[in-house]
Amino acid sequence: MSTVTEFPSATAKARYVRVSATKARRVIDLVRGKSVEEALDILRWAPQAASEPVAKVIASAAANAQNNEGLDPSTLVVATVYADEGPTAKRIRPRAQGRAFRIRKRTSHITVIVESRPPKQKGASAASARSRRAQGSKAAATKKSAETKEGSE
């Protein structure tokens, strides 16, 4: 799968990781779109066992971006991250009365693409959005009070 990005990027892959793809995806969804530092911090405290290999791949992608592409590590964002299923190793578990159950040891391929994005001024935009909302609610409140005064007269 080739992914074209609008920002400078770097890729890292971990193949044949001994964790199922569904369990890896559970952890991956926590960090998609976050900055690399924030993603590694989230994974450091995540209780899931899959967080360790995912964190290693993100750290490797960040190192690739810094060493191979010459990108600033403070501007890196986890742009694309996904886990595909790898081959499944099959084992036999002996059970009672001569039966045998199959154990599936699932593997996955984890891919991470980090991009160097310019920092956003989210503090100013969030404050302006709050002020717009507050102005709208104030206008609605004054309009409602004016209507109730007209109705009582």
From Swiss-Prot:
Signal peptide: none annotated. One of its GO terms (biological process) is translation. GO terms for molecular function: rRNA binding; structural constituent of ribosome. Residues 144-153 have a biased composition (Basic and acidic residues). Residues 110-153 are annotated as: Disordered. It holds the Pfam family Ribosomal_L22. Keywords: Ribonucleoprotein, Ribosomal protein, RNA-binding, rRNA-binding. InterPro entries: Ribosomal_uL22, Ribosomal_uL22_bac/chlpt-type, Ribosomal_uL22_bac/org-type, Ribosomal_uL22_CS, Ribosomal_uL22_sf. CDD domains: Ribosomal_L22. One of its GO terms (cellular component) is cytosolic large ribosomal subunit. It comes from the Bacteria. This protein binds specifically to 23S rRNA; its binding is stimulated by other ribosomal proteins, e.g. L4, L17, and L20. It is important during the early stages of 50S assembly. It makes multiple contacts with different domains of the 23S rRNA in the assembled 50S subunit and ribosome. PANTHER family: CHLOROPLAST 50S RIBOSOMAL PROTEIN L22-RELATED, LARGE RIBOSOMAL SUBUNIT PROTEIN UL22M. Part of the 50S ribosomal subunit. Belongs to the universal ribosomal protein uL22 family. This is Large ribosomal subunit protein uL22. The gene is rplV.
